[in-house]
């Protein structure tokens, strides 16, 4: 049963500007494992924007605002085939448990200008 749906779209250029302005941007919003993934992919802003959009989509699927958790409470990882999956921590995990959410499916894509992600909580 679907318990929540979230979608987010972001301009890749917005993330590129944030990376230029604040060198600690990635450290503040993304986990160590997520940052390792960015390095492996060459640190392209489109990849970073996709993961950011995924985090936003998950927040919406959980039905809460980000004020109830930290960005690092939502981790976007990839399996051995490269498929993204969500791992929740701390408050995000507690919120999911309280709503009887067992899994969050995620899809991420981007064009030249935008990154988009959709999350479905079950």
Curated annotation (Swiss-Prot):
Its cofactor is Mg(2+). The keyword Membrane does not apply. It catalyses: apo-[ACP] + CoA = holo-[ACP] + adenosine 3',5'-bisphosphate + H(+). The keyword Repeat does not apply. GO terms for biological process: fatty acid biosynthetic process. It is found in: Cytoplasm. Keywords: Cytoplasm, Fatty acid biosynthesis, Fatty acid metabolism, Lipid biosynthesis, Lipid metabolism, Magnesium, Metal-binding, Transferase. It comes from the Bacteria. Transfers the 4'-phosphopantetheine moiety from coenzyme A to a Ser of acyl-carrier-protein. Belongs to the P-Pant transferase superfamily. AcpS family. This is Holo-[acyl-carrier-protein] synthase.
């Amino acid at each position: 049963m679907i318990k929540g749906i979230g979608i987010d779209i972001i301009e890749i250029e917005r993330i590129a500007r944030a990376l230029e302005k604040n060198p600690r941007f990635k450290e503040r919003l993304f986990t160590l494992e997520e940052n390792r993934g960015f390095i492996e992919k060459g640190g392209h802003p489109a990849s970073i924007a996709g993961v950011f959009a995924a985090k936003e989509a998950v927040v919406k699927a959980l039905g809460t605002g980000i004020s109830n958790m930290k960005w690092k409470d939502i981790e976007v990882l990839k399996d051995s085939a490269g498929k993204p999956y969500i791992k929740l921590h701390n408050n995000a995990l507690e919120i999911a448990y309280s709503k009887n959410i067992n899994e969050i499916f995620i899809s991420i894509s981007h064009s030249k200008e935008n990154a988009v992600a959709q999350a479905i909580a079950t």
